[in-house]
Structure formats: C-alpha cells, structure tokens
From Swiss-Prot:
Chain's role: Part of the phosphoribosylformylglycinamidine synthase complex involved in the purines biosynthetic pathway. Catalyzes the ATP-dependent conversion of formylglycinamide ribonucleotide (FGAR) and glutamine to yield formylglycinamidine ribonucleotide (FGAM) and glutamate. The FGAM synthase complex is composed of three subunits. PurQ produces an ammonia molecule by converting glutamine to glutamate. PurL transfers the ammonia molecule to FGAR to form FGAM in an ATP-dependent manner.
Source organism (scientific name): Lactobacillus delbrueckii subsp. bulgaricus (strain ATCC 11842 / DSM 20081 / BCRC 10696 / JCM 1002 / NBRC 13953 / NCIMB 11778 / NCTC 12712 / WDCM 00102 / Lb 14)
Name of the protein in question: Phosphoribosylformylglycinamidine synthase subunit PurL
Reactions it catalyzes: N(2)-formyl-N(1)-(5-phospho-beta-D-ribosyl)glycinamide + L-glutamine + ATP + H2O = 2-formamido-N(1)-(5-O-phospho-beta-D-ribosyl)acetamidine + L-glutamate + ADP + phosphate + H(+)
One Gene Ontology term of the molecular function aspect: magnesium ion binding
Subunit field text: Monomer. Part of the FGAM synthase complex composed of 1 PurL, 1 PurQ and 2 PurS subunits.
Residue positions of the active site: 53, 99 (proton acceptor)
Residues engaged in binding Mg(2+) 1: 97, 539
Amino acid sequence: MMQEMTPEEIKEKKPYLDWSLSEEEYDYICDKLLHRLPNYTETGLFAAMWSEHCSYKKSKSVLRLFPTKGPRILQGPGEGAGVVDIGDGQAVVFKAESHNHPTAVEPYQGAATGVGGILRDVFSMGARPVATLDSLHFGELDDAHTRWLLNETVAGIGGYGNCMGIPTVGGELTFDDIYKGNPVMNAMSVGLLDVKDMQKGLAQGEGNAVMYVGAKTGRDGIHGATFASHSFDSEHESQRSAVQVGDPFMEKLLLEACLELTQKHADWLVGIQDMGAAGIVSSSSEMASEGKSGMELNLDLVPQRESGMSAYEIMLSESQERMLLCVKKGHEEDVKKIFDFYDLDAVVIGRITSGHNYVLRHHGEVVCDIPVTSLTEDVLEEPSEEKQPQHMIDDAAKPAWEPEITDLAKTYKQMLAQPTIASKGMFTQTYDSMVRTSTVVGPGEDSGVLRVRGTHKGIAMTTDGNGRFIYLDPEIGGKRAVVEAAGNIIASGAEPLAITDCLNFGNPNEPEVFWELHHSVMGIAKACEVLETPVVSGNVSLYNETDGKSIYPTPMVGMVGLVKNLDHLVRDSFQEEGDDLYLVGQTGADYAGSELQKMLTGEIFGSLNDLDLDHIKDYQKRLLAQMEAGHVASAHDLSEGGLAVSLAESSFGHGIGAEVACDLTSAELFSETPGRFLVSVPSEYSAEFAAALAADAVKIGQTAGDSLKLTLKDQAADLPVAELKQIWEEALPCLMKSKD
C-alpha cells in the first residue's frame, strides 16, 4: 500500500491541486476551519466535498434564482429527489443527473451507472422508480469514435434499466460537432410513492446506528466527484479508473430491500441516502449535517471487496449499489434481517454522537476528526467574472439570416434525413419501454406517459434541451427550453407540474461561460415562474470541454405533468381522415439556430427573438381545456424542423396524410418559433375549438389521403407519406454504418 504523505508533506507538495482543491481553499481550511494541517485522509475528504460536483461552489450563487416552491411541492432541492403532490395521497418523485465525463471515457459503464445512480436517488425518497428518460448529445456521425460512444452509451442505458425492470419511456438525441470530445449524457428517473412513505436523508438522535447496506466497497470511482469537476484533454482515456462499474441485479435487490423497509417498517428508520458522488463521505456528512448531529464511523467495519484499502480509498470510493441508513437504536438486527433475505450486506459502521464532529477510525487510529459543517456548509463560494460572449455582440450587428428554398420537396426530404430529426427507433428499441405494463405512451412521442395504477390518472414526462439556442442567447434559450418542455407535456393532454434540470456547461472560470450559465438560469427561472413549474431538483455539470474547447451551453429541462383522466390522453399521430388541422401559436421568422440553418449553411449564428411567456401560458391553458373536454384528436409540439417535421411525424403513426393550404412561405414551414402546436380536431368540435383558441389558432387544412399535399404562399408539393417515412427511418441506420 502506498505510503501516505504527512500533513507537512501535503502542505509542501500540494497534491490537493490535482484533486480540484485550490491553494486558497487549502489555506482557509487550515487557518480558519481546523486551525491545524489536515492529514492525507482529511485533505481527500475536503477535496471531494468541496468539488463543484458536490458543493456547487461556482454555481450556487445563480442557482438561488430558481423558483422552488408551489402549492404541490412537497420536497424541493436539497434531498435525493423532488417530490410533487398529485392528489389522493400520492406523489411523483423525480430527478435528473449528468454522467458526461464518465460516459466520455467509458461509455457503457458511464451511462449504466448514471442510470443506476439516479434510480437510487428516487428510491432513497421511499418511491418506487417507474420510468427513466435520457437526454443525449453527441458529435457528428461521420466520426467512428462518436459512433462507438453512441452505441455503447445506448447499450449501457438499456442494459441497466432493462435488468432493473424499469421502462425507458422517452428522451432526446441530438448531434453536433461541438460535442465530439465531450458528449452529454443526462438521465432522469421518475417514481411514485404514497406521501406517508416519504423519506429524507437525515441522521440524528444520539446513539442511533449508521448502517451501510448493499454492495461491497472497492477501488472503482475513487475521486469520481473531482474527476467530474475537471476539464478534459485529448488523453482523457487514461482516466477510466475514475469511472464506476455497475451491477443492475444487485441494485434490483437493493431497491426491493429498501422499499420493504421504508413502506413496511418506516418507524425503524431515521433517514436514508444514496452513496453517490464522493461515496461514503458525501452521504454520511450530508446526513449528519442535515440532522445537526455528530457522527463517528469505524471504517474497519465497512464491507470491502478488495484487501488493503486505506481510509482515503474507503471513504472516496464510488462503488455502486450502496445506501446509508440511520436506524433507530435497537432496530439494527430487524433491519439486518430484511437485507439478509436479499443476500445484501447490512452492517452497523457507526453511531450518531452528541457533538458536531465527524470522526473516522481505521485500524484503531483516528484518521479524521473535523466539524461536520466544514465539509458541507463552510465551502468557499467562487462566483466567477462574467462577460457577454463576443459572438452575441457580433451577431446583433448583422442582418437576420433569411433562408432561400427553391425546391420545397427536396428540402423537406433532406430535413427528415438530418440526424437530429430522423427516427431514433434503432436506438430506442434497445430499451424495454413496456416492462411492468404501466406504460401508455413510450419513446418517440412528445412525452412518455405512465398510468398511476388504481386511478384514472397518468404521469407525463419529457426531457428537452437545445444547446444551439442557449449558445446564441442564453436567457432567451433558457426560456425556450422550459416552453418546449411544457409544450411536450401539454401536447399529451397533461398539466405541467414542475421541472428538474441538468446544467451542462464548459469551464466556469471563463467569463463568457459563466455569463452563459448565469443568463440561462435567469431565462429558465423566468419561464418557470410564469408557467408555474417550480424547480424541485437538479444537477450542475461544469468543465465540459476538451483541449480548451467548450460544448454548447446545454441545460436540460426534465418536466413532469399530470394527466387527470387517461380517457383524454392525446397522441401525436393523426387519428382519422377528415379531421380539421389547426396551427396553434403565431409563426415568426425564427431561423437562427434552427435545423434548417444548420442544414443549409453548416453553421449556427444570429440573434433569437424573445418570447411572450404570459401569452403562451394563456393559450396553452385554453388548449389543455379543449383536450380535457375531449375535443382534440391529436396534438404535436413544434420544435426542430418546425411545422414541416411535425406534419410528417404526425402522419407516420397511421399513414394518414393531410391537405394543407396556408399563408406560410416555404421557409416559414421550417421556422422554429417556440410555443406552437399542430392539432387535429374532429369536425364536430372544430367550431368550438376555433372559438376557444380565437386568434391563437388558424385552420390550415384537413387530414386526408396518404400524402402531404402542401399549398403554400410561394410553392406547392405532393409528398407521399410512405416515402417520407422511409427516408426518416433509414437515415440513422445508414449513417451508423462504418465509413472507415
């Protein structure tokens, strides 16, 4: 075993600089918090807990802008996951997490453990996970390494979720060269619980037991939290040891054991928390801090699968499928019997103490004795300097880009073959979307929808993020992300309830990057306030750059909504011929950052038009009322590719075409003005629908035949649905074939 440095050697050689702890922070810990030099183990604990991934020291100042309260919110940010009341004593529990850095270096395990970690966050609240979603952003598919990364990532997501018996019901997948060296992998999990069973990550009550349950501890993932708080260079393949290894079968056992405990014997329990980033130190210190308690742990008692592990390694290991419990004194054996039944370790490794110190013993020696709050609450915040990106200033001085479309049919077909637009079926078929048979709507539609068993209710869920728009204007782009998510929820006939987020950005020490972070949060916060969708959980992933080149700022918004009656669930496919087609929302010249701009120019540039959030909220509510009255046959949110893509996708489900005649130009057919919907309405409800939506809906045609017959202001086209669908379905399989 390697000889650890002495406190004096640490001060002299500064190994903490490689663990994302700055010299200023180290000196502050020595001089202000401990009044002595920390030893090797203590220094490692501070480095992990003070990393951006655990502490949000860079981003905390802007995260405070988020609205987090509302009449349905039972638990906001700060716990394992957010909890939202859906009535009848039930709640929906959800959270999203990023696993970008691990996925970049070991994509299968990086993605798999991303799913595993977010599932544990949900069942640590006492909820049974019922669904997962993802948000994936990769480089262009002409690169062999990118194709490998994508295949392995999808396999990792599917492999873990399928083994757990939890359906993957939705998500998004986009492609842009900016993500080539640093893909974005965000996972979201949704669970359901009876409100009476809700748990918290809390440790208090002198003498109560700290119990370690689940898999044994190994050396995988050590310093994973600090790894996620660093930028990449082109040699990041060497960092695979920081990636955890998952075992979904072990997690399935852990899930069932934990739910048996929380649902049948909650009176034995004080608190429960997942061992995620920074492993034992994070879960234990956070639980003690939340309980305003002290804690003493004996690391010799921690179940270990490798010999000779140091205290440093035991505390910072991020081995998967582990939970930490605070159990009332006298019930330790009762809890152990539950976990014994599932053949899982369940060991008392410490006790709650009366003081406020965090004490660790290893091989009979005290290897850590520090105030609990020094790890969790005394972190030095580091807001960065800010500067508006120069490209925004330059673009604002230029005339807006106007596309020229000379051949509508050709452009339409090219659009459907774009990787971001094309069918993702070859990837989503990897996922089991129907396991446990609660899935009503699976991948490929605006929202995934699951029934709430024993009721007529459903839960709609979606993930949305478009880095191009955030890059062009972070604040407006942030608003658009929330509006897009709300549009997906509304299109299913659901009421938007709340959001979770993953904030994926570059190096926050760059003033332009921090400006993007700050202003995107401003935009998301504003939209959440207006649309009444508070932020209940989330995650920040910074330092997403390779060799100094940042990804697009890519916040992901995960939204959950309530379908009050599944009889009025709305799908995105045209249902019958002869229904009237309406375009809801006004169409503007919104081409900056659009799929059309990328396709025709190969670049992204320009300025975004702002949104009237109050107006959008108003007609969204009127549209939802029409859906709940049973007046809407189908609805599809308009996003990438605009009305053109939504028309095509709505026709693919049942092969029903449309005859469209409207005042839009060929270019406007591809405009990406946010907040719009394509709605089909049975003729008997058409007049009532038109009256309710008034000037916010215009009739553009009818469903009919087996082709899209378009008569626009400047061009016309007759496009067979079968031909369009073939292009759309075959594009990605063709691109994924080796070109080497």
